[in-house]
Amino acid sequence: GSEMCIRDSHIPEPDNLFDDFSYRGTAIREQTLTLYKNLSHSILVGDPGELGELSPDQRKAWDAYRSKFSKPYQAMNLNWSDQSRELSRFKYQSLLKNFLASGAGIDKNVGRIRAFLQENDLADNTVVIYMADHGFFLGEHGFFDKRFMYEEALRTAFIVHWPGKVEEGVVNDRDIVSNIDIASTFLEMAGIEIPQEIQGRSMVPVLEGKTPDDWRKTFLYTYHELANHNVCLLYTSDAADETC
């Protein structure tokens, strides 16, 4: 199927796959997003702890599936800790093929949802939105993951099908919207009053091609310190590892 076509393909590399940070600022020189150094085996093939939850038959099927894609790496005869360009290229191909295979699976299942709406006469009365909470580096600058403030991590997918409201095929790459706008947008779509204290603004006029003159032109992004999500870290005289 589509996944095997992806697996058998060679994905073109971005021009800046081997970006040089040696002459740049501290933040980019000390980031932990590089393919050659930070993309581990477990990220590509799954954490061993997670695989331990599989039944023997499931594990056998998983190992057989993965072996088809590990053979090229084994043929390279490189250590996973090696920082050569050959291993970086292998990691890039593996990352992109995993990503594209996942995207193909999403596309297939979005199609199933759309088909259900059509078959049950719901398509004209349903808003379908595909979105993500962040962008992702796919080899650009030699990176994977997110967080670093480059275009690839800041831009996110936000695709809207709203019959009678949003013109098909129109792309808006000018106006700045944010995930804080989503709640207000959904409320207006549903005809519900938007509370004054809510953050963000409804994107409905933007989606309709009627962006207000006072729509935001700038925004601030920060990501710093100890990035332990949902954990409050307290500094002490000895360390910063106590939680509250």
Model segments located where?
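Residues that cap or initiate secondary-structure elements
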Residues: 164-166, 226, 243
